[in-house]
Amino acid sequence: MWFFNKNLKVLAPCDGTIITLDEVEDEVFKERMLGDGFAINPKSNDFHAPVSGKLVTAFPTKHAFGIQTKSGVEILLHIGLDTVSLDGNGFESFVTQDQEVNAGDKLVTVDLKSVAKKVPSIKSPIIFTNNGGKTLEIVKMGEVKQGDVVAILK
């Protein structure tokens, strides 16, 4: 199929600062145990889908979302560190598991001020749990706006 050879553009899920996984204070992400990727230090409360695809994972705690693209690439957006312990408090989800989403669709609103007081960090990793054999290229570091192209999977 033609879409298997296309590059996948990955959008910033929110306003913030793009950082490397080396700057995330969690060994699972820093050591890339779940896959390669990058993180965003968020500055806006609304988080949007970084790619189009099927929402294969929507945690009931609303802190993490897994999206599978039509080409089979799987991306995990994990909002903050140890946020699973909040049991959804401070998170309002707008999507359900198995829903199709388009890049830029709003997934969740997070009360970042409240959440930041209760967890080690609000840095939010975007991980390629299945990169489909492609190579990740981060094309924009530092300050970004939601919807900016920040990475390309080639």
From Swiss-Prot:
- One Pfam family from the UniProt entry? PTS_EIIA_1
Instruction: Tell me if Nucleus is a UniProt keyword of this record.
Output: no
What residues does the record give for site: Important for phospho-donor activity?
Answer: 63
Q: Where does Zn(2+) bind?
A: 63, 78
Catalytic residue positions: 78
Function (record text): The phosphoenolpyruvate-dependent sugar phosphotransferase system (sugar PTS), a major carbohydrate active transport system, catalyzes the phosphorylation of incoming sugar substrates concomitantly with their translocation across the cell membrane. The enzyme II complex composed of PtsG and Crr is involved in glucose transport.
Q: What is known of its domains?
A: The EIIA domain is phosphorylated by phospho-HPr on a histidyl residue. Then, it transfers the phosphoryl group to the EIIB domain.
Q: What is this protein called?
A: PTS system glucose-specific EIIA component
